[in-house]
From Swiss-Prot:
It catalyses: 2 a plastoquinone + 4 hnu + 2 H2O = 2 a plastoquinol + O2. A plastoquinone binds at residues 213, 260. It comes from Prochlorothrix hollandica. Gene3D superfamilies: Photosystem II protein D1-like. The gene is psbD. Chlorophyll a PD2 binds at residue 196. This is Photosystem II D2 protein. Pheophytin a binds at residues 128, 141.
Amino acid sequence: MTTAVGRISDRGWFDVLDDWLKRDRFVFVGWSGLLLFPCAYMAIGGWLTGTTFATSWYTHGIASSYLEGCNFLTVAISTPADSMGHALLLLWGPEAQGAFVRWVQLGGLWTFTALHGAFALIGFMLRQFEIARLVGVRPYNAIAFSAPIALFVSVFLIYPLGQSSWFFAPSFGVAAIFRFILFFQGFHNWTLNPFHMMGVAGVLGGALLCAIHGATVENTLFEDGDDATTFRGFEPTQSEETYSMVTANRFWSQIFGIAFSNKRWLHFFMLFVPVMGLWMSAIGVVGLALNLRSYDFVSQEIRAAEDPEFETFYTKNILLNEGLRAWMAPQDQPHENFIFPEEVLPRGNAL
């Protein structure tokens, strides 16, 4: 009789866990998943809970949940009260002292959602790094995704850290984001900021490049079959090109006089434009956190003040910003009890 003795594995628990995390399954987990999935679950769950049940009466003096009659466009998880400063508002912290209802009333769901959301986005970027390493491709997807992460962190975390409290961050909601955009314009003249201009150029330029690239590829597809649709005219694993780069180059050379000479430079440019635009916008928001000014054309302001017949679109915008500040502040910050006398409210030939 033969006795088979099993070989005892000399692998440690770390190697076993590493194999399990990187196992080929329908939804890849990986080490990054240990950060991504719990944080994403908490952030999404916190947002759904807050927009369904939580009021903003104690922080902003408004209604912000489905339970109070709001719809999808007007619900929000509002920022904490201005008096909370930059407290993390932990459920067990000195502010809420373990009372869940009090924690929600003070705005604890906002810090909960913001921090878990930030770590979830970082986990998603690390997930792309991890899968790229396992598959054996370059990590440019993760590098590209760093741009929206930078923008999220700068707007939702760094900007309010530069201000007096979390109160001045955007609340998590559609209409709430619109309010924040108006606030940015009125108090920082954001649209005239060069970093915002670079961000707009990057986003719109990226959209234009995508549209041009997609149309050009569709225009120059090889007719590999007699099917009615071009989607059946190729095999996903074929070694041959599915469109003609030479024809595309000739087409755009005739239109602009110049064209991309190879696919590598073309696709790098499509990556570079929107990513750098978002990065520049994020840097600009960090500047606003420090209350840095955008372009100020003081000479035009002085001349407009002295000459009622002189105005430019810049001086018009300055007056509009003053109106936003004067009329928005009492509504946006009711706890300050702002009362502006009539003589300081903006008036002039631009309004």
